[in-house]
Amino acid sequence: MSQEYLDFELPIAELEAKIESLRAVSEQDGKIDLDDEIKRLQKKSEELTKKTFANLDAWQVSRMARHPNRPYTLDYIEHIFTEFDELAGDRAFADDKAIVGGIARLDGRPVMVIGHQKGRTTKEKVRRNFGMPAPEGYRKALRLMEMADRFNMPIITFIDTPGAYPGIGAEERGQAEAIARNLREMAQLKVPVICTVIGEGGSGGALAIGVGDKVNMLQYSTYSVISPEGCASILWKSAEKASTAAEVMGLTAQRLKELNLIDSIVAEPLGGAHRDVAQMAENLKQQILADLQDLAPLSTEDLLDRRYQRLMSYGYV
């Protein structure tokens, strides 16, 4: 997969292009030694990347959360879990490809993994409905959660959606009811639930698999009731004010941690999760393992009480 750069990364992209060009020349003509120049440019690129990513504003973080190269749920499943067995369908209407889920092992322990899934190619994006689930997707997720509850398996969810699908068919099949039912049922599950926002956390579409004992966010992910463009269109009547909206919405991991709405921020590799997927997956795996260890001593009653108190604390500063 070719590397893509956002506009604020263009100076970095130019340096990387120069490095690749020098490497190509060096490989074509072994008599030309360009190692020192390549090392100098690599150091300069790393320093520029550090400087750029040390000062990202909320709008830039929003765009990083949607980066086309960013790892999706199936990428993390491949790197973190073993023996993944995908389960399909809501047993009522259809199998929604915008939600993936199934049984897997995490360091040998059976777990239920559920997450939003976007696509990379045009065909795959359409098949996954751009990561926007219909009611049958959320009902599939709930079916798998109830299965995990019966067999005492921890539930791991990965959140990455611009929102629930707002189409007429989805509304006719009960989109709001499906989301509301998931919120209610997840609050009562008797097994540990660990949720992580890996990209976009868009409104009720994210919350429908986001009620948990631990809620984490990747460093450059977002979590909000509406997209910055949507907010700008409502408040300023112009999507061009999206950058202003992003700042006032408080949608970054750092801001939500300050408000105690999430538990942990999972560090991303320099330049974002897509720059080193294996390292990002390892960071996320260690956070999930730490969360499971933290929840392990709790009895079912304590787990449910802790989750209830957590939910009831929302809205208080």
Curated annotation (Swiss-Prot):
CoA carboxyltransferase C-terminal domain segment(s): 40-294
Keywords recorded for this protein, A-Z: ATP-binding, Cytoplasm, Fatty acid biosynthesis, Fatty acid metabolism, Lipid biosynthesis, Lipid metabolism, Nucleotide-binding, Transferase
Primary localisation category: cytoplasm
Compartmental location: Cytoplasm
Xref: InterPro entries: Acetyl_CoA_COase_a_su, ClpP/crotonase-like_dom_sf, COA_CT_C
Pfam families the UniProt entry points to: ACCA
Pathway, per record: Lipid metabolism; malonyl-CoA biosynthesis; malonyl-CoA from acetyl-CoA: step 1/1
Catalytic activity from the UniProt record: N(6)-carboxybiotinyl-L-lysyl-[protein] + acetyl-CoA = N(6)-biotinyl-L-lysyl-[protein] + malonyl-CoA
E.C. code: 2.1.3.15
GO CC entries: acetyl-CoA carboxylase complex
GO biological process: fatty acid biosynthetic process; malonyl-CoA biosynthetic process
Molecular function (Gene Ontology), one example: ATP binding
PROSITE patterns on file: COA_CT_CTER
Oligomeric form and interacting partners: Acetyl-CoA carboxylase is a heterohexamer composed of biotin carboxyl carrier protein (AccB), biotin carboxylase (AccC) and two subunits each of ACCase subunit alpha (AccA) and ACCase subunit beta (AccD).
NCBIfam families attached to this UniProt entry: accA, AccA_sub, PRK05724.1
Function field: Component of the acetyl coenzyme A carboxylase (ACC) complex. First, biotin carboxylase catalyzes the carboxylation of biotin on its carrier protein (BCCP) and then the CO(2) group is transferred by the carboxyltransferase to acetyl-CoA to form malonyl-CoA.
Family: Belongs to the AccA family.
PANTHER family: ACETYL-COENZYME A CARBOXYLASE CARBOXYL TRANSFERASE SUBUNIT ALPHA, ACETYL-COENZYME A CARBOXYLASE CARBOXYL TRANSFERASE SUBUNIT ALPHA, CHLOROPLASTIC
Protein's name according to its UniProt entry: Acetyl-coenzyme A carboxylase carboxyl transferase subunit alpha
Lineage summary: Bacteria, Pseudomonadati, Pseudomonadota, Gammaproteobacteria, Pasteurellales
Gene: accA
